[in-house]
Amino acid sequence: MNPNQKIITIGSICMVIGIVSLMLQIGNIISIWVSHSIQTGNQHQAEPCNQSIITYENNTWVNQTYVNISNTNFLTEKAVASVTLAGNSSLCPISGWAVYSKDNGIRIGSKGDVFVIREPFISCSHLECRTFFLTQGALLNDKHSNGTVKDRSPYRTLMSCPVGEAPSPYNSRFESVAWSASACHDGTSWLTIGISGPDNGAVAVLKYNGIITDTIKSWRNNILRTQESECACVNGSCFTVMTDGPSNGQASYKIFKIEKGKVVKSVELNAPNYHYEECSCYPDAGEITCVCRDNWHGSNRPWVSFNQNLEYQIGYICSGVFGDNPRPNDGTGSCGPVSPNGAYGIKGFSFKYGNGVWIGRTKSTNSRSGFEMIWDPNGWTGTDSNFSVKQDIVAITDWSGYSGSFVQHPELTGLDCIRPCFWVELIRGRPKESTIWTSGSSISFCGVNSDTVGWSWPDGAELPFTIDK
């Protein structure tokens, strides 16, 4: 073989080896691509950040967690059997209130994508607590936030996000179209109640596990409305209170018993001279207690308690430590409506302990500012204004707003009692501040039988925003 033939032979061999190597590399790339496609083909669309999604399959919770690793989402599942939130325990004995959450939504919303909201509330399942809120179909610091002081519009929706997080399009879940709402968990699925429609014919849409299961039509054709806080569940049944009729006179009030999203029973209260709006309800020893707003003529709060058959009792908190706003200075109370400064009002709550009562209220007697918790050891039945504990929550120089109760069941906490908790809305913007919008953040506390501290946890946002200038 001459030198030229040797060169040609060696070159041919090298070319063959190179072609084979190239084909192997192409095959390797195709194999990796096919393997990746099979692995991720049945998963949800990639998200820009980590998130948890809970679905329901045959009364079993499936907790799906997406973990973002090198732009690839790996899905892990952990099935958790559903339970029944019994609600048969008593409220836990407490000596004060420990801070639980604060979302700082307005502060974050000056630069980030945060919903314009009002009427936030918290509700817990046996696995998690979520903040529910009524959006205005707009973001803070955006042109669509203009005019959001309005309570009822077709753009308002009930949404929810993990407790303590600022409500944004990236962490929030749509629940219902609503300008008045409630929600609660029976241990198997979430029940949501969303009211929308015209003032003279609104309809409440009930959803169970996200599916429409029932509706309730306005029966007085005068702004059907509900709690703006969580409904209460006992032994698989959930209970809510609705109002239909004048906000400044005698209206109609109904209790609804709901099972798996279907109304199974309702009772209209026989309550002349009473006014119930925006009730804050909680379970206690198998029964339900609701503390409400009298927007007609009471500066103390009306209550209704009932058993699972909807057999009920009604009254007003007797204490001379008045809980509504506006209200007179503390003095001599009444077990009926206290008339001075009794018109108008604000959503609030109290927790009954025997003859005693924890009263949550604004610090100001005539504006929605400040917040405090007061323990009146005889206030449920006694009319004096003596109290033994006062815990500061928000200073009188800072804005507050609505407040309401929620509970954490033993199935969540591992305690042998129902833990009482509350949230406070921190309203900012119109009508008290020079902005084009109205919105709020929230803070929450839970009752404990250990050390606590009073302080001020205000909203803290610096206004006006860029859109307001």
UniProtKB/Swiss-Prot annotation:
A GO MF label: metal ion binding
GO cellular component, one term: host cell plasma membrane
Record-given protein name: Neuraminidase
Domain description: Intact N-terminus is essential for virion morphogenesis. Possesses two apical sorting signals, one in the ectodomain, which is likely to be a glycan, and the other in the transmembrane domain. The transmembrane domain also plays a role in lipid raft association.
Miscellaneous comment as given in the Swiss-Prot or TrEMBL entry: The influenza A genome consist of 8 RNA segments. Genetic variation of hemagglutinin and/or neuraminidase genes results in the emergence of new influenza strains. The mechanism of variation can be the result of point mutations or the result of genetic reassortment between segments of two different strains.
Native species: Influenza A virus (strain A/Duck/Hong Kong/2986.1/2000 H5N1 genotype C)
InterPro entries: Glyco_hydro_34, Sialidase_Influenza_A/B, Sialidase_sf
Ranges facing Virion surface side: 28-469
Native organism taxonomy: Viruses, Riboviria, Orthornavirae, Negarnaviricota, Polyploviricotina
Catalytic EC class: hydrolase
Binding site for Ca(2+): D294, G298, D324
Annotated catalytic residues: D151, Y402
Disulfide bonds: C92-C417, C124-C129, C184-C231, C233-C238, C279-C292, C281-C290, C318-C335, C421-C446
Function description: Catalyzes the removal of terminal sialic acid residues from viral and cellular glycoconjugates. Cleaves off the terminal sialic acids on the glycosylated HA during virus budding to facilitate virus release. Additionally helps virus spread through the circulation by further removing sialic acids from the cell surface. These cleavages prevent self-aggregation and ensure the efficient spread of the progeny virus from cell to cell. Otherwise, infection would be limited to one round of replication.
Glycan attachment points: N50, N58, N63, N68, N88, N146, N235, N386
